Swiss-Prot record:
PANTHER family: CYTOCHROME P450, CYTOCHROME P450 MONOOXYGENASE PKFB. It is found in: Membrane. The chain crosses the membrane at residues 5-22. It comes from Penicillium shearii (Eupenicillium shearii). Its EC number is 1.-.-.-. InterPro entries: Cyt_P450 (IPR001128), Cyt_P450_CS (IPR017972), Cyt_P450_E_grp-IV (IPR002403), Cyt_P450_sf (IPR036396), Cytochrome_P450_monoxygenase (IPR050121). Heme binds at residue 446. The gene is esdpH. This is Cytochrome P450 monooxygenase esdpH. Pathway: Secondary metabolite biosynthesis; terpenoid biosynthesis. The lineage of its organism: Eukaryota, Fungi, Dikarya, Ascomycota, Pezizomycotina. Keywords: Heme, Iron, Membrane, Metal-binding, Monooxygenase, Oxidoreductase, Transmembrane, Transmembrane helix.
Length: 501
């Protein structure tokens, strides 16, 4: 009797497994892609684990077309025409479970990880106005102060010495966001290069783990179990920099709660104080909003900005004609009295045509985030070209792949050519701009987009006007991807220009 029950149980398990395997295999059977992707997500895990998933994804789309099956239930789309469908301004396409790995199981959702549209709106709506250009005066002050600190460090170096421009850009981006959030900079610019690099790379060490885990529901669940075990055993797996940031945020919240000082948002206060003031006047805001947003600003904001600046500098140094064009534009505006030194004002650089073209080209070629932004197909299903995706299918678009889509950006889409943004018609320019999802799209556009743009547009001209820079080894620049890009090998020789104060 027992053996009969065991046999029935085994048959039931096998039948269930066979059903699910067949369902996984056949529900997207008409969509092209690697055979192994039809039956397992392990190929996706391996692609991200290789740190070259952006290149692999791009090759897969070159081989199979605009719509490619990446996993049993995951489809990647390359055609920018699908952006407004997959990432609409209205609700409908929820974020997938991919985003679970970016927070601990016991942490509440933030504006990035929230899947529920209602929670996302509650978290985002009250704070969004603080990220508009008109509200970022305190950010410009932080940028100016940190450019001065960066120049002080660079001026002290002997002319002709090799220096890692990547590390300086990362340190600047981190200190600037830190000062914007908490008034005083962290001090990354004053650290020695070895200590500085080690501290800055703590985020990358985390993403090397959670990047691959994000590609498989089984591994995501395993990550939660591992985290629970580590917590139970009191094993610390959180980088010191992250812990220090959390501690400072908590301390600032406690100080604000106990303070009797009257403040208002029009005072010269840092971003965290503005957020705390906003929260104190709105009882509907979840209690964790300020702390979660502050962490996002510090870590996601600084890393992503540094990647874009690194991409810009690498290509400007590699293509000296582009750098000369940008330099000439700056000198021309300076001669007209519309650009000041040593640090140009935001109002002076926000509309420079060639600077805009270089920034757009950097955002297009190497966006900071290079995995598909996953969404869940709603109950209505989704038709993409000749293909139908049933409800529950995961669908996503990678900023890296979309930004190199040749029917929109040209047959030279893999090449650096800022002039593509200047030579085209206004209609084609709008089409290219709407075809980039570097900062997301629809209802989920990144809050920090304007923060990054202001930092980049002020720092790049300031450095170029002050220093003559030469790339020491054009072949040494390397990029890796595990959700965020990581760059290294941007070693340069910097010489202060004659007449620079």
């Amino acid at each position: 009797m027992l053996s009969q029950r065991v046999g029935i149980l085994i048959i039931g398990v096998l039948a269930t497994a066979t059903f699910w395997l067949c369902r996984r295999y056949f529900q997207l059977r008409g969509i092209p892609g690697p055979f192994v992707a039809r039956i397992t997500n392990l190929c996706r895990v391996r692609w991200v684990g290789s740190r070259k998933s952006h290149e692999i994804h791009s090759r897969l789309h070159d081989q199979y077309g605009s719509v490619v099956r990446f996993g049993p239930n995951m489809v990647s789309v390359a055609d920018p025409a699908a952006i407004s469908v997959i990432y609409p301004a209205r609700s409908g396409f929820l974020k997938g479970d991919f985003y679970h790995v970016f927070k601990s199981p016991d942490e509440p959702p933030d504006v990035f990880t929230a899947q529920d549209e209602g929670i996302h709106k509650t978290l985002r709506a009250p704070v969004a106005p603080y990220y508009s250009f008109s509200k970022l005066q305190s950010l410009e002050t932080a940028i100016d102060n940190n450019i001065d600190r960066l120049f002080h460090q660079l001026d002290r170096k002997d002319s002709g010495d090799s220096t890692s421009l990547t590390t300086w850009l990362q340190a600047f981006a981190f200190d600037t966001v830190w000062a914007w959030m908490f008034t005083n900079p962290y001090g990354m610019l004053e650290m020695g290069s070895t200590e500085e690099k080690k501290t800055l790379e703590s985020n990358w060490e985390i993403f090397q783990i959670i990047g691959p885990l994000s590609q498989s529901s089984t591994l995501r669940n395993l990550a939660g179990i591992i985290n629970a075990i580590l917590t139970a055993l009191k094993i610390d797996s959180i980088p010191q920099l992250h812990k220090h940031t959390v501690s400072l945020i908590k301390s600032r919240e406690e100080q604000f709660e106990s303070s009797s000082e009257e403040l208002n948002a029009s005072d010269n206060v840092d971003m965290m104080t503005q957020l705390l003031l906003m929260k104190s006047k709105n009882s509907m805001i979840p209690p964790w909003t300020v702390s979660s947003l502050s962490l996002l600003n510090v870590f996601a904001g600084s890393d992503s900005t540094a990647v874009v600046m690194g991409t810009m500098w690498h290509n400007l140094l590699l293509h000296r004609d582009s750098m000369q064009c940008l330099y000439n534009e700056l000198l021309e505006h300076e001669a007209q009295g519309s650009l000041t030194r040593p640090v140009p004002k935001w109002k002076e650089v926000r509309g420079l045509a060639y600077l805009d073209a270089c920034l757009n080209e950097a955002l297009r070629l190497h966006p900071p985030f290079c995995l598909p932004f996953e969404r869940v197909v709603p109950d209505t299903g989704l038709s993409i070209g000749d293909y139908y995706l049933p409800p529950g299918t995961l669908v996503g678009m990678s900023p890296y792949v979309v930004g190199r889509y040749k029917p929109v950006f040209g047959q030279d889409a893999d090449q650096w050519r800022p002039e593509r943004w200047l030579e085209c018609s206004p209609q084609d320019q709008r089409k290219m701009e709407s075809s980039m999802i570097t900062f997301g799209a629809g209802r989920r556009v990144c809050l920090g987009k304007n923060v990054a743009i202001m930092e980049i547009k002020k720092l790049i001209p300031a450095i170029l006007l002050r220093y003559d820079i030469k790339l020491l080894d054009p072949t040494s620049f390397k990029v890796e991807n595990s959700w965020f890009f990581r760059q290294e090998g941007l070693d340069v020789e910097m010489k202060k220009r004659d007449g620079s104060a």
